[in-house]
Swiss-Prot record:
FAD binds at residues 501-511, 535-537, 654, 724-728, 753-755. Its cofactor is FAD. GO terms for molecular function: acyl-CoA dehydrogenase activity; flavin adenine dinucleotide binding. Homodimer. Belongs to the acyl-CoA dehydrogenase family. One of its GO terms (biological process) is fatty acid beta-oxidation using acyl-CoA dehydrogenase. This is Acyl-CoA dehydrogenase family member 11. Keywords: FAD, Fatty acid metabolism, Flavoprotein, Lipid metabolism, Membrane, Mitochondrion, Oxidoreductase, Peroxisome. Its EC number is 1.3.8.-. It comes from Gallus gallus (Chicken).
Amino acid sequence: MAVEPGTSEVRRQHRFDQGSLERYLCRCLPGFPQQPAGALSVRQYSSGQSNPTFYLQKGGQAYVLRKKPHGPLLPNAHKVDREYHVQKALFSAGFPVPEPLLYCSDVSVIGTEFYVMQHVQGRIFRDASLPEVGPAERSALYLAIETLAQLHSFDLRSLGLQGYGRGPGYCRRQVSTWKRQYDAAAHTDIPAMNELAKWLANNLPPDDDEEALIHGDFRIDNIIFHPTEARVLAVLDWELSTTGHPLADLAYATQFYFWPTSLNVLGQGSVFNFKGTIENPSFEELISIYCRCRGISTTIPNLNFFLALSYFKMAGISQGVYARYLIGNASAESSHEFAKMVKPLAEKGLELSKRLSFSSIQHNTSGELFYQSRKGQEVLLKVKQFMKQHVYPAEKEIAEYYAKHGNTEERWKKPPVLERLKEMAKAEGLWNLFLPAVSSLSQLDYALIAEETGKRFFAPEVFNCQAPDTGNMEVLHLYGTEEQKKEWLEPLLEGKISSCFCMTEPDVASSDATNMQCSIERDGNSYVINGKKWWSSGAGNPNCKVAIVMGKTKNSSASRYKQHSMIIVPMDTPGVRLIRPLSVFGYIDEIHGGHFEVHFNDVRVPVSNMILGEGRGFEIAQGRLGPGRIHHCMRSIGAAETALEILCQRAAQRETFGKKLYHHEVVAHWIAECRLSIEQARLLTLKTASKIDTLGNRKARKEVAMTKVVVPRAVLKVIDCAIQVCGGAGVSQDFPLASMFAYIRTLRVADGPDEVHLSTIARWELLDQSKKLTAKI
């Protein structure tokens, strides 16, 4: 039998009656192997400084047991019953925690209360710099911060955890509690602890009434990651969980960026000897990720208080661990090391308290208007190099493939050179750059990359960043169940399959999405889909294996915006029919898999294929379309740059009436106007991306609508000027301008026509103006 990593024989001070435990589990734990499945094996985890934790194994089944320590304990500490109940609530809500199986309050079984949970197989990283993994994965792992944001977004009532905490005043109680517990455990006087406690008590944040479910000890070595992927499987150690201010968790999770250089050891390894690098997100980037996920501003007042509180708390924990060591009741072998940590931790807390504020966005001294992360700069440079070395040279071969197969079924397949480029990009880590959870890039970072890929229409697919797959992957990432992610998101992320999105319908005015007629009706353990869709981009690709379909679910009592749902439909499901490809200004657009009319006739899929729940379709659509519209716009700006380049080359090569075209003032003015249009469009798009990063999708709705109107108009103007300078050649197959124009023109209709976005802009503008007026509009 393989030994569980990180375990040892049960330490003498934590031994208990294993026979009694085995008999109890045989009686009370469903599924626990009965005799004669072999003896129960018990080993103790070497990590963990609080509640002793044990690995149980019998008959091929593995469990984890957490118990109270023996002997005298600090007041109100080691509440394993609270750990069990909060994990049970979170597991039921789909949050990544080990499944809690059983709680035992009968101290006669093993001498203390305990609970048992399912063992989760995965990786735990004890060193925050993650030396065990490669650079690309290392940065993605830090997006465990998304998991923290998810935790803080839960409604306590929906979890059934009303009364779990003690109500408003969390920060005040924390200062008081940790001061009291430190005083009870102190073995010597440390002036810095007293001074820090006094400062915290006198500088409580004004919003101390904010309440969310918080973990209390959220850090990377309390997280189990997937064995091979950068994915969180379980968050551990809920002993300190309660309801309180979420920024306390955020500060605690990011405190290692400020860790005292004199402290290289915390139990095991150089856990906090860490600074941000190109591969590791900076403190500012982690804060930005968290704020983006929660939809809050990245300007965080009082962050110095929460960081100082984190160090005060760490000092108190360290003192408590050492106190248990002195009485022979420590949970870990390295507990004696903690005595020397209290003073440096307190001093660091005092240092942080003197910082007036922390901003998640660093002030840029390079002259750039928008902040681009270090990793964003690095990836953008790599993408530019890849485009120059591999993508541009492949353009001719790809064009020849589609010209050769334009009237055959081969046109729906991908050119071999494109598949080779995809493998090369994937090998270089230039893959799935659009998804923050994978790339660690902000929307602003990706906006600049999307512009670069937009310079060639086939380039986004090289990096697995093509629509509609990007939007579908975002939907599954944000709203899909673990089962849905495993079956569909993972192969999409790997580039093994493609997808289509079915929303627009031929028989209704789709600019008002509530007109939708496609029905999704519950029938036992299935949903039945009936309806017609068109402009389903990518459906002609032979590799298109799944569609996300939006339709109406029967709920007459709900508002008109809560009657629609999104559901996953495998393309090989009986009743799914591809009717015809739709042309765009005469182009079939084979390179993007075409734009198909698709009919769904009595299509039956399992209930588990519903995304997020009935009536949540518009909610999902808004989450999907916000960033997606920005991605389209930035790619369009890349196309505009290509068109302007063609314009200038033509103007420099051709002569009329005895002089170069660019010497004609009208052409020179066109060139200038095109540059103005591109720069204006880019600035608005980057502002919108930055606002999504800092305030979230909802707060950026006005800017998203403005960008969606402005950019296609500006780009069409540039392409039209380029066509005019090129003359007849500009509308021929010898130049990409005609197909560019056709594609960009569709963006004034796709993802909502200009008129819908203009109405949105006007509505938000009136609301903004009304705040400035005394009379209500």
